[in-house]
């Protein structure tokens, strides 16, 4: 016990704190203490330092689409442990745990809806579900979204957040790279726009396929984008990587992506962009 604690009487509060749990949150970048309701209004972007925190697939879709006329696509697809895969834990058990923790059946949510009144289809990866890894259900849902666009002449937007292919599905997972790329080729043939939004992180097989095949490839600020991670590359080449390597600003400078958009401006910016692509310039004045 310190000397100051000995001479000062022990203070006791007569009233309990009126601040309920869950009111405050902390920025993982600048450590600022933030009012949670304000953070939610900012779509999990720190108002102090503009750090873009990771958000769930459904929160992203909710913040992006209009609230009316929504319809989920591909929700009938469910993961199967075809290979009976087991590492330190059975794949079946990993799936059950991920489903319980996230409330999702797999790592991609696809939704038909409206963007400032313009019909669109949006896909969003759920990174909390096994690292947003690409697997059979992810590929099937993605293709379902593309097919809906082809049938109804709609633009397609995908928000990527993934560590890459799901190793527990082996070649079934890798096959989704070709499957999704072939589906997007049909979009291109029909002249329908596909906008790819790369968020933190977009890595591995997802970055090597659907994430970089957009007619327009945009990214959120400071998103990690690449194939292998920076630590793996440094260990392989035995050299220190440049500052900001694999971050969206670095990729924009090198011409790998087209633009960087703040999450809070994503809806209005893409609405204007797609309005021009679809000949609906009156979507957003």
UniProtKB/Swiss-Prot annotation:
Subcellular location: Cytoplasm
GO cellular component, one term: acetate CoA-transferase complex
Gene Ontology MF term list: acetyl-CoA carboxylase activity; ATP binding; carboxyl- or carbamoyltransferase activity; zinc ion binding
EC number from the UniProt entry: 2.1.3.15
Residues in CoA carboxyltransferase N-terminal domain copies: 23-285
Transmembrane stretches, start-end: none
Entry-linked HAMAP family: AcetylCoA_CT_beta
Protein name (Swiss-Prot/TrEMBL): Acetyl-coenzyme A carboxylase carboxyl transferase subunit beta
Source species: Colwellia psychrerythraea (strain 34H / ATCC BAA-681) (Vibrio psychroerythus)
Gene encoding the protein: accD
């Amino acid at each position: 016990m310190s000397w100051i604690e000995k001479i000062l009487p022990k203070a006791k509060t007569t009233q309990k704190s009126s601040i309920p749990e869950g009111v405050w949150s902390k920025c993982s970048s600048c450590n600022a203490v933030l009012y949670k309701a304000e953070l939610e209004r900012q779509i999990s972007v720190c108002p102090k330092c503009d750090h873009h925190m990771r958000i769930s697939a459904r929160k992203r879709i909710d913040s992006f689409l209009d609230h009316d006329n929504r319809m989920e696509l591909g929700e009938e697809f469910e993961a199967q442990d075809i290979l009976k895969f087991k590492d330190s834990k059975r794949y079946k058990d990993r799936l059950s745990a991920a489903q319980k923790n996230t409330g999702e059946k797999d790592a991609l949510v696809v939704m038909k809806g409206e963007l400032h009144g313009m019909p669109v289809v949006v896909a969003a990866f759920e990174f909390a579900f096994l690292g947003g890894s690409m697997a059979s259900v992810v590929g099937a849902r993605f293709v379902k979204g593309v097919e809906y666009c082809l049938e109804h002449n709609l633009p397609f937007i995908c928000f990527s957040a993934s560590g890459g292919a799901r190793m527990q599905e082996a070649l079934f997972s890798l096959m989704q790279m070709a499957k999704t790329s072939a589906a997007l080729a049909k979009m291109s043939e029909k002249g329908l726009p596909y906008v790819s939004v790369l968020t933190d992180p977009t890595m591995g097989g997802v970055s090597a396929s659907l994430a970089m095949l957009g007619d327009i490839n945009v990214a959120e600020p400071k998103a990690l984008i690449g194939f292998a991670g920076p630590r793996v590359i440094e260990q392989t080449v035995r050299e220190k990587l440049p500052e900001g390597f694999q971050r969206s600003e670095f990729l924009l400078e090198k011409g790998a992506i087209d633009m960087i958009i703040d999450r809070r401006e994503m809806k209005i910016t893409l609405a204007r962009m797609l309005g021009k692509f679809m000949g609906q310039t009156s979507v957003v004045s």
